[in-house]
């Protein structure tokens, strides 16, 4: 079967283009001269492709005039001329006439019914859709959708009874019109048509009724109605036919959507009124009415804008915008606009977005070519002055340099080639010289210094052309001399041989690309090539013609080549530009930018949508001069881009559509008259420099934005730029909203910014277009994608309108028409929520398509009913051919195959619901098998009469022969018995014609095409597929890198009929297509007449594998992927048997209005693409910039990834590279240790996408959370054929379909695996390479010396960045050094520590997830050794204190309990923050701490070539390993130069010491391993401790005490004063917390417990629940609360509920909503965000440190606050914990409660409770004191000594007598606390004297502390709280250590037993 999917020779993007763009500017449909031909010809004009011209313009064309004269001869007077606005109403009246005709002739009946009556009853069609929807979710069987659809269609028929007949009529007319030439040849016709068609002269006459006749010529249609004739040009007729079909689609779809109550769909009456609105305008105003129609889009946008907050709008919301667009309208026109505004007033944003797509429903105006020329000339010939010298231009050029240079540095870590003035000493220059990152906030940064930066040659120009880009079959302009010759001979401008680019290419020998561009840059284009044709744009709404440019061949080469250079090399440094972004990237970017619009509380985000007046034509040389010069310098060719406007000025411009008379001129080619031909036009041309001018526009915007505050984000391409600006404010009222004053200030800021934009662009000669430039706080719109307050708006109507088979642009075969419909359906599905209505539209048009095929096929002459019915078709069963005679083709059976037989199984290829659901599913065969198998079963369930058809259809049979070319082309294809289709046959025609072509001036191209001759290509396919097992993906990649792929791609590009005509004298393409089409239709009619070789019963994965093996005769690896629709089943109710192995789903809201029009709490899943985890070598990446080498280079990554180097397969993989260059491929092969990731999962082929994205509006996904983490059976790490993106998308889609059908589900769902055979292990070829290795070695074609496909190494140049990378690898010797392959913990810790420090400094950027994964793997103490050692070297080389360091990577690795303890206790770093919310450190503190630390032993290091900064790694190794080098000045200088990169000139495994020190005995240990491959070696217990001793970390002088003294002046301490150790100590006291929970549960006996979803807390609660006894009549509800989950966040947590006791006393809930009501609700460890959910009377258990964080958010009525109302008694209760930390139980606004203490507790805790009841403020202080002083409490001598060690370590024995005031506050307070504790603990303490303590005298040299007292006896108020605290603590404890008071007051000796006072060093304390 020849599938229509992407082949290996076709260009393939990562996904379908996200842009809904116009056709390529170089593509046009030129009217070619008709030729007499005895063969069949293809009309091709089934829909309007060109702009409409007036009758006078058309008569200037001699062909049209000649056809008109012939028609008059044949039929006489042509009658009334129907204008373009009258044709549609005329055809509608004619359709109504036929619909009401009762003559009942076969033709009339056929037109009346068409394909609409093929399915017997509309209820039958609806049942088909219900069964199809049931394949997604079985619950749709009882949804009642069939009744709804049938009812909606019935209403449509009632209100529009004649529309179906009109559609059928125009479809039949279009077929006849496009086959006029064939009917003239008396070809066979369908009997119904044959009886009603005759030929009169050269005119085809169709007799519809007695009084209705239609006359068709090639360019004019005439209708005779009751003796009155009406004529219209073909273009007018096509225009009307398009709109009739579009209106049918729009109105029918509106009825369906309204019937199904799809949220956001506009009411049908509004759709009809809007259509009538436009019709009435055109009826009243004629063609001029399009001036009003053209404002429809802007008006709809303006209505949406009018909903903005007027207080924030810089204008008046949408009001000013609506007024601006009406400025040029008269009163009558303005009234029309006002009426439209009134119509739209009550519509929601979703409805308005949908209606926005109707802007082409009123067809197109007749263009005014002369007016368009004058308007164009007015713009292009206006004088603008010297724009380049203006300050705004200088600012913009500086902005370009800034953006480019800084982004270049970010991507490469070095600057591009830059020249600076020798004597300049500016900050920017110094950063560039020293390769330091430019900090724009630096005090010395000066924006104007960018003027000093001269860019150099950063980019190289490739040697070779991309021949496939050149082969685009687009229109060009003849040269001047060719135009002169052509005008002299024919007086016309049409000549396909001169106007088709590919024909010109075949006749022109090209010099290499670099040579060509060098010639143009130095000398410009030859004057003969300076010519530009202007061709009117099609399908516009503007009356004044707009033109795109047709360039001469060489001019086109110049502009396309230079634009391609910008796109491939420069554009990547401007991420704001989205011209090359894929769909997923754009959706993510638009979603991110628009999400800021959701809330405008603390900040306001504005969307500024900019459009420019004649953007292309405003681009003058003076506007672009600064940029063009800079770009030229970047490519090393002055003049490369600067030549652009000189070429424009030198060019002669002419109107190229043939409607204007051109006079030949021997000097200029065409005589200049300044009307239709002119010169000296230096302005830009439409679409010629899009990328260049887009870059410049971005720089303009950036230049303005830098002067204004706010956060800016830009997205755009071309003249449509969308900017979001966010302003923050602190002017918030008590409700959390921005105050009026705050709004006013923000509005003033944005208004000032917009004014600055307008002023800047006006000065730059690029005025903004008022009618399309607007500012909004709600609407984000880019390229027809709309978001309102962050919500993507559904808008399918535009795509739905084009759902008809004749909108196809290729040959009108069954497959191409079906795929055209399928493409339109997928596009519409992307902008729709529910696909049910679209399925109905598909069935309608699929039925019509079946009717077209049998009754009025576009290839009518060869496919008629008689030939189909009397033919013979061949099917194959058991590899034996069977001839089947076709007696009669069953229309219903054909329609069912069109609708439901997927293309992968031999069908026409119309889409089903599975294919509409997502994009990117990798195996369409398995998907198709699953669909058909389930669909046939559900048809039986719904009682469909068509179930027997589908039962026979659900199977495949295989071809009797095997040719592996289709499999290699499409790796998923099957070898079916399907004949080659018409479209497939079309592929062979260009190939045959090119080989026989009479053209061939381009010898290099002729030589390339010559390899298609002979049997060599077939032999290659036989050889490459000769293995016993087919590793088809690798085979595909190999083949796509050969010259055969180049030639096949070239032939596929030659697809224009007119082009093919000129290639050979004999043209019989249509006969070949028609013959293939006839065979295919006959085949479809008999396909299922006999039982297939394989019928679809059972697992689709097994069936797919069987089909592949049986069809191809060999097993096929790596392509079979089961669809989740097969093996996943949602359990919609709680009554299911759960195997605890499932995907977990949570639904936050099921109201379909809410879910589709508002964002939910979850981040919507937009899909994902998998990425390859490793890169090519630097050398391979450098050579890959040459297009000729890129594909063959890319497949070299497969070596050592899929196949080992040295194997036969590796040599075959290298062969395509050897065929195109003389470079040794071995240099490009990556080492096996660097490869990472599975090939089947990670490899991105050019033939399919790896990943998947939803193909529907994603708003409902924000209300769904899904986790695959609970699918334990298929956990991460297993190599299985699961497509997880599809699992997520398809599961969510099932829920959406149910929601849209008003079928609700539980909030929590389980998705279980229902098929145990679908998922299987992926087979790896490494297990047995002999099976996949070809038995015959293929021969690869090569053309040495052909510059199109062969490049010698000496001809290749590199970009500067590539040169630096390759040169770096060469200079450090990393390419050929000796490496170790046995990795261990040394390599793991060396690499991880180096990578961390590289990220800290900013050399690299690893994802956060990588570091988070290392938290539990690493030994933090061991890692600290490496970090400290590397830091010593880094600090010695440059001043890191002045470098912006990001310690985030280090903190992420250490974000665990043990990690924080190592940071704090071992490394002395003060860590703040929380483990959950992120740690933070002071940069100076961490730098000082690391500097002060020393290690007793340097850990062993290794050098990893896979990590960055290899030379710095090597230098670090030498400095750490050989410390003696630091004492040799020569060695030190060598290493310093090596570090800086100035002396990198030797192998890294050589001895780098000087000649005297070097002995050659040592060298670094070198490895080359991906960091992920070393993770398993991050051991925590190091073996051989005798050999490898861990050094001890000693504290430096800057080591701080970690306790912080809390200020007691305020009621609450600042939460910032709480260190991370306090928090960890509090949270790590698991036993204390469990005891506390037990006490609380026993005390309160709660009926509801609310807890956060943390594993540890859930486990503690589970154990408590097992112990606690509940009242027999009670039931405990455990409510697990999750806030704002993403789709994968909560996986493992969901499963914790299984661990709770399983009996009727416990009920575990998991909900996003408010917890259930209860008498006693208990919140365990609530977070800040959940406190607001607590009700009056709820009880909270909060750790005290968290309470400090949250106390501001607790309501003022809570008794814990000082400011409180007079309410009844509250209770505050604390239990003692380890470390003196506490948990708090707080009853929140509770009623009076009498508490009895049921459990024993200490007397201290009782005291606290009493105090808290009496005075909560003092009680709170007491708890703070307990936390602060707990370290100084002691009962034993050992505890006293531990407390003393804390003080002892803080004393500096420097021999100087100091007092406590010389210490920091922390030290002073610690000493005071310690002394007070000892004093209050002493025997016979004199409390009155102790309380007069004044200060403590410290004698560091004696290690003695002496308390000093106030002689006056005044009590020390400062320390009163400490005295009070220790008095109460020690009053409840019996002393176990005797401390004499008399000794203590003399002093406390911490280490000297010989001094006076109390000595801790002696056993009894005596001195």
UniProtKB/Swiss-Prot annotation:
Main location: virion
GO molecular function: ATP binding; GTPase activity; mRNA 5'-cap (guanine-N7-)-methyltransferase activity; RNA-directed RNA polymerase activity
Annotated localization: Virion; Host cytoplasm
Entry EC no(s): 2.7.7.48, 3.6.1.-, 2.7.7.88, 2.1.1.375
Coiled coil: none
Enzymatic reactions: RNA(n) + a ribonucleoside 5'-triphosphate = RNA(n+1) + diphosphate; a 5'-end (5'-triphosphoguanosine)-adenylyl-adenylyl-cytidylyl-adenosine in mRNA + 2 S-adenosyl-L-methionine = a 5'-end (N(7)-methyl 5'-triphosphoguanosine)-(2'-O-methyladenylyl)-adenylyl-cytidylyl-adenosine in mRNA + 2 S-adenosyl-L-homocysteine + H(+); a 5'-end (5'-triphosphoguanosine)-adenylyl-adenylyl-cytidylyl-adenosine in mRNA + S-adenosyl-L-methionine = a 5'-end (5'-triphosphoguanosine)-(2'-O-methyladenylyl)-adenylyl-cytidylyl-adenosine in mRNA + S-adenosyl-L-homocysteine + H(+); a 5'-end triphospho-adenylyl-adenylyl-cytidylyl-adenosine in mRNA + GDP + H(+) = a 5'-end (5'-triphosphoguanosine)-adenylyl-adenylyl-cytidylyl-adenosine in mRNA + diphosphate
Keyword Ribosomal protein in record: no
Keyword set, alphabetical order: ATP-binding, Host cytoplasm, Hydrolase, Methyltransferase, mRNA capping, mRNA processing, Multifunctional enzyme, Nucleotide-binding, Nucleotidyltransferase, RNA-directed RNA polymerase, S-adenosyl-L-methionine, Transferase, Viral RNA replication, Virion
One Pfam match: Mononeg_mRNAcap
Domain RdRp catalytic: 604-790
InterPro entries: L_poly_C (IPR039736), Mononeg_mRNAcap (IPR026890), Mononeg_RNA_pol_cat (IPR014023)
GO cellular component, one term: host cell cytoplasm
Keyword match Transferase: yes
Residues in the signal sequence: none
Oligomer status and interactors: May form homodimer. Interacts with the P protein.
Function: RNA-directed RNA polymerase that catalyzes the transcription of viral mRNAs, their capping and polyadenylation. The template is composed of the viral RNA tightly encapsidated by the nucleoprotein (N). The viral polymerase binds to the genomic RNA at the 3' leader promoter, and transcribes subsequently all viral mRNAs with a decreasing efficiency. The first gene is the most transcribed, and the last the least transcribed. The viral phosphoprotein acts as a processivity factor. Capping is concomitant with initiation of mRNA transcription.
Protein family per UniProt: Belongs to the rhabdoviridae protein L family.
Designated name of the protein: RNA-directed RNA polymerase L
Organism field: Rice yellow stunt virus (RYSV)
Gene of this entry: L
